[in-house]
A protein has these predicted regions:
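FIC/Doc superfamily catalytic core
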Residues: 1-223
Length: 223
């Protein structure tokens, strides 16, 4: 996939941010796995990330964790972090997140989906609309954290892909945020129940500001 790499020098701030995210990689993957209902302990998750397997964990859960690792490693690459946080980037992240589960996990959803625990049924996404909307969000005159949150929540609510939308949306938002040298965004284990509740409310029409304030306060780590 030609993602339009440019070889320009990264600022010291962005290089520090890459190190900061790498130093927290295992914890971030663990937190994302918790949000997905993957029942591994932190030591098991660490083991999977380091060795690719662990006794007593289902193949599905191992694959999900390895996919998260690959998607994070992808965005933390020095070339990739210089690429635009656009629709093509989102699709590539989704492809990595869905690897081994769907043949075309990075392709826009062409089938209806239902989301458990909510009456909200996302309409079928239209590629040109998603491309345009992501560009619009990104070009707003707002703080990077506000833009990252909006990118994340727009992609989740749109359910751009057949599966892996929460995982892909969070990693995509981090691609944008880290490229701005503004920390990272992950829902910590202890904030997951509250996040799920706010997510349903957001899907059902609650304004973005509500879950946005929660994400900014509880899920944003800066340095």
């Amino acid at each position: 996939v030609a993602l339009g790499y440019e070889d320009k020098a990264l600022s010291a701030r962005v290089l520090q941010n890459l190190d900061f995210a790498r130093a927290n990689l295992k914890a971030n993957i663990y937190d994302q796995a918790v949000l997905e209902g993957v029942a591994t302990t932190f030591p098991q998750t660490e083991d999977i990330i380091e060795n690719g397997q662990v006794y007593g964990v289902s193949a599905t859960d191992v694959q999900k964790i390895l996919n998260l690792k690959h998607a994070w490693e992808f965005i933390l690459d020095r070339d990739v972090i210089q690429s635009e946080s656009n629709y093509h980037m989102l699709c590539h992240i989704a492809k990595l997140v869905n690897e081994g589960f769907f043949y075309d996990g990075g392709r826009i959803r062409g089938i209806p989906v239902q989301i458990g625990g909510t009456s909200y049924v996302p309409p079928l996404p239209i590629e040109t609309v998603v491309i345009e909307r992501i560009d619009e969000i990104r070009s707003q005159d707002k703080e990077p954290i506000e833009i990252a949150i909006e990118l994340c929540m727009y992609c989740m609510k749109t359910q751009v892909f057949k599966d892996g939308n929460k995982r892909a949306s969070v990693i995509f938002a981090n691609h944008y945020l880290i490229a701005q040298g503004m920390g990272f965004l992950v829902i910590p284990e202890k904030a997951v129940p509250e996040f799920k509740k706010l997510l349903v409310q957001y899907y059902e029409g609650e304004p973005l500001e509500v879950i946005g304030a929660f994400l900014k306060e509880r899920c944003w780590k800066n340095f």
